[in-house]
Amino acid sequence: MAGAAVSNGGLLPNMEDKMADDRLIVALDFHDIDDVVALVAELGDSVSFYKVGMELFYSAGAEVVPFLKNHNKKVFLDLKLHDIPNTAAEGLCSLMFQGADILNVHASGGYTMMKTAVDRLHALAEKKGMPCPKLIAVTILTSINEEDWAGLGMQCTIREQVVRLAKLAKSAGMDGVVASPQEAAAIREACGPGFMIVTPGVRPAGASV
């Protein structure tokens, strides 16, 4: 069972506790909502947080988020918005009404895009009397390797850019970032405690799948 780990203080959470832990987010990498229904039933109360990405949202988004919320689950809507500031911000405002607990954008969209998104989302939540979802930024996609990085013409290292983008996201008011476990320590040192770090592709200790 692969998913993402969330850290707000230490580097990585302890995954030994079998009770539901909001620091473990299970990825719903499906096209069909029937697969979601089956997995949520199988995992029951042991998991409280699920990640819905493009694959599932584009095929069943209108059904899957309400289904999860109706089962008292938290939702990380992983759509990685990246557009001009107004478009990204308005897209996030529309997604807020889905009931997601975490939304995200690409940090490479820049400070203005992230700041506009934060301000617009908080203003709308206050106006509507709704809880504001956490807003986090993707630093560098974990699939990017050194060859890909060089092809982009980047002069700094991947780690240096991850830290730079994390600090930019924090300065824009973002709640945290998505980054690989390899960069978690450097981000924590640069951004301090209380800044959310979501690390994808982790498995809890003792997981059989």
List each model region and its residues:
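Conserved anion-binding
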Residues: 21, 87-91, 98-172, 183, ...
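Hydrophobic faces of well-ordered beta-strands that scaffold small-molecule active sites
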Residues: 24-28, 50-52, 75-79, 105, ...
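Phosphate- and divalent-cation-binding pockets in alpha/beta enzyme and binding domains
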Residues: 35, 60, 112-116, 186-187
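Glycine-enriched alpha-helix->loop->beta-strand junction motifs that scaffold or abut catalytic
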Residues: 44-48, 72-73, 96-101, 173-175, ...
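Generic structural signal for hydrophobic
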Residues: 42-43, 68, 94-95, 169, ...
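N-terminal glycine-rich anion-binding loop in soluble enzyme alpha/beta folds
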Residues: 17-42, 46, 122
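N-terminal amphipathic/basic-hydrophobic helices that include classical n-h-c signal peptides
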Residues: 1-15
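Metabolite-binding pocket within alpha/beta catalytic cores that recognizes anionic/polar moieties
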Residues: 51-102, 106
